[in-house]
Amino acid sequence: MNTNHIRQVVIVGGTHGNERIGLYLVKKFNQDSSLLFRPNLTTNCLIGNPQACKENQRYIETDLNRCFIKADLDNHLLGRHEEKQAKVLHEQLGPKGNSENFLLDLHSTTANMGLTLILVNDHPFNLHLAAYLTHHNPQVRVYRWTQENQENAFVSSLCQLGFAIEVGPIPQGILLASLFKETETLIHQTLDYLEQVNRGASPPLPKTLTLFQHLEVVDYPKTSNGELAGMIHPQLQGRDYQPLNPGDPIFLTFEDQTLFYEGCSTVWPIFINEAAYYEKGIAMCLTHKQDISLK
């Protein structure tokens, strides 16, 4: 069991301005800090992109959650709104990769992701906490977005300890009470765990953790001019975290032609048909489901 002492917990909402659950949870906690009180834990909440939240837009000029590459944080010539805001957050929460703070970044998605923890590293502390949360709520899934030899650019990468919470499905720009409450419960369960760690206790954990390891992203079918040529197949829509086998339908073209998954092994797609990913050329992320032993 990793015995890190957590100096402070930072909860970030509104990294994307049209994801309102995180924003309004942060506002709720800031209005009544006693909701987060734990005797051995200091917790602070902040809004990641206040201007985007004010305008109810994902971002002003570029995606804040892709602005945390270290070279970009050190490059003061980068002057777009979110690039500047990333530097502000880095000054508050950095240096990047520190292990003193624990960071929770709150997100929501139009995809049928349920309750998902997104890990951006293999730190044992994060894996243990993820196992604790999945043990207390089997509906929670764990997605590990790590790629070999590629630095992560997410807000949550500012700290070694922590992760993003992604909940859905929910349309952009609105609140859903059920997902709001489920996210709030996850936050409280996380703080309960961290409080135990700071007291020197070792919360009981399962011996294994099921996680979904990132493999690759898949784009939509496109024309030779780069225009959209199809959409998610009806048989795949909403089936996040369900197995996709070679030969299964994956896309339907505008001419009603079914395109089939041509991979050589079973994968588990997630973020299927996420609205914000159209501009990124991402129809879904493919993952591999695996059980890992906890040390």
UniProtKB/Swiss-Prot annotation:
Its cofactor is: Zn(2+)
Q: How is the cofactor bound?
A: Binds 1 zinc ion per subunit.
Q: Which of UniProt's keywords are assigned here?
A: Hydrolase, Metal-binding, Zinc
Q: Which residues form a coiled coil?
A: none
Q: Which residues bind substrate?
A: 58, 65-66, 166, 277
Q: Which reaction does it catalyse?
A: an N-acyl-L-aspartate + H2O = a carboxylate + L-aspartate
Which Gene Ontology cellular-component terms appear in the entry?
cytosol
Q: State the EC number(s).
A: 3.5.1.15
- Cytoplasm as a keyword? no
Q: Which GO terms describe its molecular function?
A: aspartoacylase activity; hydrolase activity, acting on ester bonds; zinc ion binding
List of residues binding Zn(2+): 16, 19, 107
- CDD domains in the record: M14_ASPA (cd06909)
What PANTHER family is this protein classified in? ASPARTOACYLASE, SUCCINYLGLUTAMATE DESUCCINYLASE
HAMAP family recorded for this chain?
A: Aspartoacylase
Family named by the database record: Belongs to the AspA/AstE family. Aspartoacylase subfamily.
Please report the name of this protein according to its UniProt entry.
Probable aspartoacylase
Which species is the source of this protein? Acaryochloris marina (strain MBIC 11017)
